[in-house]
Swiss-Prot record:
Belongs to the universal ribosomal protein uL16 family. CDD domains: Ribosomal_L16_L10e. Keywords: Ribonucleoprotein, Ribosomal protein, RNA-binding, rRNA-binding, tRNA-binding. This is Large ribosomal subunit protein uL16. The gene is rplP. One of its GO terms (biological process) is translation. It comes from Desulforapulum autotrophicum (strain ATCC 43914 / DSM 3382 / VKM B-1955 / HRM2).
């Protein structure tokens, strides 16, 4: 599972998802990509599940890139614990996704296969996406 090796602060405020992404909206490495069309959080388990679905479909041919990283800790208190007594321990790592962000890229595979593989990967994610290609 993806998670940061070292953080300056162990816990972070929840914050709000709004606006457009500051970068990562264009295809940089590959010829085909998966682009987010809405805001949301994607956790490390979803990222890994989508990556596995992608690589199984293309049978390890070509090359893929994951263009985002889960760098935000999400905390959760245990079940049946009273309120107060501080913030709970880190439960998961998530990536904050804004519309237009490129999530996955790939090259070295035919267009139809890339489209199908990225469609399978998109089913594993919690945000709406669309298929994009280099023009």
């Amino acid at each position: 599972m993806l998670s940061p090796k070292k953080m300056k602060y162990r816990k972070r405020m929840r914050g709000r998802l709004k606006g457009k992404p500051t970068g990562g909206t264009d295809l940089t490495f590959g010829d085909f990509g998966l682009q987010a069309t809405e805001c949301g959080y994607i956790n490390a388990r979803q990222i890994e599940a989508a990556r596995i679905a992608l690589t199984r479909k293309i049978k390890r041919t070509g090359k893929t890139w994951i263009r985002f990283f889960p760098d935000k800790p999400v905390t959760k208190k245990p079940a049946e614990v009273r309120m107060g007594k501080g913030k709970g321990p880190t439960d998961a790592w998530v990536a904050a996704i804004r519309p237009g962000r490129i999530l996955y890229e790939m090259e070295g595979v035919p267009r139809e296969l890339a489209k199908e593989a990225l469609r399978l990967a998109a089913h594993k994610l919690s945000v709406k996406t669309r298929f994009v290609e280099r023009s």
